[in-house]
């Protein structure tokens, strides 16, 4: 059950057997009997939905979950540096995405680090949707749930959840208190006039800054009630008027947004005065008891701004850990660019496998354990990290290789006519995995003549007189070859005989029983399409399953097409890596 929950609802016999044998080596003599039992139990577990598996695990095996959490704490402690002034049981972290788009690999870093630190210190993690900009960063109604799904897929569990657009009354109350203590003022002058005073070092003399508390409260009430139009007034936080960074000087806490033109997907046009990121985030971090903020170093300026707000209200600022940017080479990670591609119809959706969105990586065949391992290895380093896809692929390969079934396929298939077969019909029993722990399939081939298919990339390498080993089957001698057709005859049966001739080993597919396949291979901004044929066992594949196309690479089943009778017509796969 634990194996299934950890791998998207699909348990595998191999890893379960490996775990049993590792913990109970005394059972090795009974391995054959045990694997039969394990296979039966795995089949039963895989019939359950992921939610049913999780429920049963929590209800019946909660001790297993706690044991796993303890191991995770110990592992995290070895990989992550300690947080400053962190007390066990009192650490509160948060992940605060903007639901204007789904999350990508870069966003996953603060999410995973915040979660892992919460686990490490037996604290709690908060999920907070920061959606207070309905005009520029318009929230997508579907993004809230999509982000939740991505986080759950990554193995992240949060203790509390908040949506900022549903907390507007709280921000209004805090804004009023800020005005009352002289920490904010309403600015109804033009942005150009404010910038002139600010940039000339005369901000102390800026007329709106000199207003009384009573005047500002009256103007604030007008802002909230809709008396001002968009761009006619803002609420500013008083800071150091001579701060060396001009952008820090009296930053904007609230602005007017015409929600009759730009309605918010959750609250419509109920509000017109909207808090900026720096105001809402700072207030929530205090009210939600956040003790440690983990975020990219690009937010360092925001930390400085928010500290002025805290000082006005007599609050203590949380500890902040800034880390560098994380970039996946060759992938687009800019939200604006990704949105532009979607709007232009260039992409196949938010889960386009060319994108570094979590959904895109998942669809491509990257498993959550690989993403977690990558992020933990990068950690909280202050320097920017540029990761090649090869690095991520290497981690992913090490995880999926032990549990991925092997399937033979011929891309751009070329027929090979084989004569002289010493049988009328022969069954080849081929294991799905070299370990022999994932079961086997049967591939049949008639005789004394038969046609098989091989990949065109192999066919063009063949020449008259070549001895070739057909994987897990027999050896042939090439009689004649062209890029479109190969003639051959039976040579011998065993691998040893093939080795004597240094024969290459290639995959093959019977001509009389096969399944059409389509492999989509992301290459930069291109999605290269390759068609082919796969062995009959491909008909058993399910969407979401990750396999290895022998000598081609690992791929994830994207879809399975059937005819009106339910017979599999085609399997579409997305290439992950070699």
UniProtKB/Swiss-Prot annotation:
Subcellular location(s) per record: Cytoplasm
Segments spanning the bilayer are none
What GO molecular-function term can you cite, just one?
glutamate-tRNA ligase activity
Which reaction is this enzyme known to catalyze?
Answer: tRNA(Glu) + L-glutamate + ATP = L-glutamyl-tRNA(Glu) + AMP + diphosphate
* Keyword field contains Transferase: no
Name a single GO biological process.
Answer: glutamyl-tRNA aminoacylation
Broad class of where this protein is predominantly found: cytoplasm
Q: Which UniProt keywords apply?
A: Aminoacyl-tRNA synthetase, ATP-binding, Cytoplasm, Ligase, Nucleotide-binding, Protein biosynthesis
Q: Name one GO cellular component term.
A: cytosol
The answer, when asked if Amino-acid biosynthesis is one of the entry's keywords, is: no
For this chain the motif 'HIGH' region maps to 97-107
EC number(s) per entry: 6.1.1.17
Q: Which domain of life is it from?
A: Archaea
HAMAP family in UniProt: Glu_tRNA_synth_type2
Q: What does this protein do?
A: Catalyzes the attachment of glutamate to tRNA(Glu) in a two-step reaction: glutamate is first activated by ATP to form Glu-AMP and then transferred to the acceptor end of tRNA(Glu).
Question: Which family does this protein fall into?
Answer: Belongs to the class-I aminoacyl-tRNA synthetase family. Glutamate--tRNA ligase type 2 subfamily.
| Full protein name | Glutamate--tRNA ligase
Q: Which organism is it from?
A: Hyperthermus butylicus (strain DSM 5456 / JCM 9403 / PLM1-5)
Gene giving rise to this polypeptide: gltX
């Amino acid at each position: 059950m634990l194996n299934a929950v950890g791998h998207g609802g699909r348990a595998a016999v191999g890893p379960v057997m490996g775990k049993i044998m590792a913990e109970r080596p005394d059972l090795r003599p009974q391995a054959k009997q045990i694997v039969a039992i394990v296979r039966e139990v795995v089949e039963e577990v895989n019939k359950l939905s992921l939610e049913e598996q999780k429920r049963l695990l929590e209800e019946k095996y909660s001790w297993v979950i706690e044991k796993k959490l303890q191991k995770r704490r110990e592992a995290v402690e070895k990989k992550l540096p300690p947080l400053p002034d962190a007390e066990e049981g009192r650490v509160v972290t948060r992940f605060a995405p903007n639901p204007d788009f789904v999350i990508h690999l870069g966003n996953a870093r603060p999410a995973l680090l915040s979660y892992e630190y919460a686990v490490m210190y037996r604290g709690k993690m908060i999920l907070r949707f920061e959606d207070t900009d309905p005009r520029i960063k318009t929230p997508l109604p579907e993004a809230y749930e999509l982000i939740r799904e991505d986080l759950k897929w990554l193995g992240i569990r949060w203790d509390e959840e908040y949506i900022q657009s549903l907390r507007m009354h709280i921000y209004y109350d805090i804004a009023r208190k800020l005005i009352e203590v002289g920490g904010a003022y309403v600015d109804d002058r033009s942005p150009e006039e404010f910038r002139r005073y600010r940039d000339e070092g005369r901000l102390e003399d800026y007329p709106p800054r000199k207003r009384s508390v009573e005047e500002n409260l009256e103007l604030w009430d007008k802002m909230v009630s809709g008396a001002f139009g968009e761009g006619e007034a803002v609420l500013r936080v008083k800071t150091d008027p001579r701060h060396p960074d001009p952008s820090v000087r009296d930053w904007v806490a609230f602005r007017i947004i015409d929600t009759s033109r730009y309605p918010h997907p959750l609250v419509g046009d109920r509000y017109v005065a909207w808090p900026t990121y720096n105001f809402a985030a700072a207030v929530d971090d205090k009210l939600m008891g956040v003790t440690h903020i983990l975020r990219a170093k690009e937010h360092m300026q925001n930390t400085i701004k928010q500290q002025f707000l805290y000082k006005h209200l007599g609050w203590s600022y949380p500890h902040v850990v800034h880390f560098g940017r994380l970039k996946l080479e060759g992938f687009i990670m800019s939200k604006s660019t990704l949105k532009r591609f979607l709007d232009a119809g260039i992409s196949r959706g938010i889960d386009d496998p060319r994108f570094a969105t979590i959904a895109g990586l998942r669809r491509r065949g990257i498993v959550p354990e690989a993403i977690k391992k990558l992020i933990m290895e990068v950690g909280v380093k202050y320097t920017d990290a540029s990761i090649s896809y090869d690095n991520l692929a290497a981690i992913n390969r090490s995880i999926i290789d032990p549990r991925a079934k092997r399937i033979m396929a011929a891309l751009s298939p070329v027929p090979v006519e084989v004569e002289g077969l010493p049988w009328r019909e022969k069954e080849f029993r081929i294991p799905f995995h070299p370990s022999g722990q994932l079961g086997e399939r049967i591939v049949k081939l008639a005789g004394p003549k038969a046609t098989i298919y091989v990949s065109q990339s192999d066919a063009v390498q063949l020449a008259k007189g070549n001895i070739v080993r057909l994987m897990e089957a027999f050896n042939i001698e090439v009689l004649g070859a062209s890029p479109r057709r190969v003639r051959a005859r039976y040579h011998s049966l065993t691998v040893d005989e093939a080795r004597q001739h240094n024969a290459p080993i290639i995959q093959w597919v019977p001509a009389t029983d096969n399944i059409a396949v389509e492999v989509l291979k992301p290459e930069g901004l291109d999605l290269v399409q390759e068609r082919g044929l796969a062995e009959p066992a491909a008909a058993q594949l399910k969407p979401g399953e990750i396999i290895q196309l022998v000598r081609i690479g690992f791929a994830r089943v994207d879809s399975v097409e059937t005819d009106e009778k339910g017979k599999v017509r085609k399997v579409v796969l997305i290439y992950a890596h070699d």
